[in-house]
Amino acid sequence: GLNVNRPIEDDELDRLVAAADLDELVRLVDTRTSGRDWEGLFRLRERTRAAVQTGRQLWPAATLAEHRLALYGESSWACRVLDEESGRFAIGPLTEVVAQNHAWIDLAPHLPHGPRRSFVAYERALRGDVVGDEVDEVLDIPVPPQDWEPSYPMAEYNDFGVECPSPLDTARLEWHDIDDESDFEPIDDPWVDRALRSLVEPWTSSSNGRAESVVVAGSASDALHALGIRRGRLAAIDPGLAMAWLAWCGASGGAHGRRRGAATGRFEAWWMIAAIGGLTDDWDEFRECGELADEIGSVLVNTQWWCFDDGDRSSAYRLSLVASLADDDPENESATPLGVALLARDHPSIV
């Protein structure tokens, strides 16, 4: 292996760093990527990152070099950019970038034990890879997807960016108008509110977004009325699509925030389901006795899910979801169902 502490002569790189020539450094990143010069690309990353100590702001070149190494580099080189200082200005977690084009069997020997190894394992498992049992469950949920989980939307990173369309973009929906009349009892549920805010946190903290939830004793239409939506449409969707939509939201950075990655999105979706099903207080107990996955899956598949349309076309990032849960008391035949409406929006700034 390369001793990265020993100075290597690289006259072209050193000249560009000394001149703080960002444009030419980006071209050099392109050249070394296309030539598969991973050693040279890693050296570029190291020296542009160190340039800040002499007052040169070359972090865009360092960030681009990290991105290319993680995306295209041989596994040994790709894993070198997963240190604690990397990815600070990246468009998404480098653990997700690395997982896109590298198999776990090739990555595992080069990943030291710790959270980043675990995050890569989660990401690879979501892509259908078989990951061994030696990985810590740092996200509090099983590494391999469960039988009841859907195929989650995976990001596609490219040379400069990332694409990850919402699973709702291609869904075929049958709409019907919401009821004109409403009769509901509002329920204060701080767990649902906090779970939604956690789910779309980058949309609201790093961007222009908003998030709002309501819980009512009432129907799906009642829940929308409680949100202040008097005219709108509902379409039934299957539990898998609802789960995939939640996970997509949790993975996304919204219009201007930093993407958090599919592994985090999946955890946020589990936590949102737990909040809707009233399982948050018992999460740790269920996890310790190995019942958490079954409990979350049971809430998901036994809930009626709806997408709603409130006429808002301005938001590129949206969650418009209603959950309708039956009362779980078998003795209560006349129980009113529980309606949970989740609304989140984010959109690019209009200059």
PLM regions: where:
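Charged, amphipathic alpha-helical stretches
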Residues: 1-68
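Detector for Asparagine
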Residues: 3-5, 101, 158, 208, ...
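Generic detector of well-ordered alpha-helical segments enriched in charged/polar residues
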Residues: 14, 26, 30, 193, ...
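Extended, low-hydrophobicity segments enriched in charged/polar residues
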Residues: 52, 62-265
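C-terminal, beta-strand-rich globular interaction domains
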Residues: 229-351
